Swiss-Prot record:
This is Chemotaxis protein CheY. The gene is cheY. Phosphorylated by CheA. Dephosphorylated (inactivated) by FliY and CheC. GO terms for cellular component: cytoplasm. GO terms for molecular function: metal ion binding. Residues 4-119 form the Response regulatory domain. Involved in the transmission of sensory signals from the chemoreceptors to the flagellar motors. Phosphorylated CheY interacts with the flagella switch components FliM and FliY, which causes counterclockwise rotation of the flagella, resulting in smooth swimming.
Length: 120
């Protein structure tokens, strides 16, 4: 059975790019969200195997959403994706429970490496 993934990014183009990489490699994208608040709702609704989460988004940022999802499901597997290679953001995300961090613009193999490492 394919692993079920939730993609969270406020940019439709980024969601499309990540979805394309995942679908071509046998993953099932169960839902997409464009902000952190939507991400929390979609997580509750779909219970995905993994979440790719942008950090900078309107309404609720990715780190806040990460913390809220972790309160719902301590075992949640979340990979942060962000153009900000800022050390403090990476540290905040990892301390909040993120499993990995991908810096945009990313290569498909880096996305797959992070996802496969997190799922196994």
């Amino acid at each position: 059975m394919a692993h079920r993934i939730l993609i969270v990014d406020d940019a439709a183009f980024m969601r499309m790019m990540i979805k394309d990489i995942l679908v071509k490699n046998g993953f099932e994208v169960v839902a997409e969200a464009e902000n952190g608040a939507q991400a929390v709702e979609k997580y509750k609704e779909h219970s995905p195997d993994l979440v790719t989460m942008d950090i900078t988004m309107p309404e609720m940022d990715g780190i806040t959403a990460l913390k809220e999802i972790k309160q719902i499901d301590a075992q949640a597997r979340i990979i942060m994706c962000s153009a900000m290679g800022q050390q403090s953001m990476v540290i905040d995300a990892i301390q909040a429970g993120a499993k990995d961090f991908i810096v945009k613009p990313f290569q498909a193999d880096r996305v797959l490496e992070a996802i496969n490492k997190t799922l196994n």
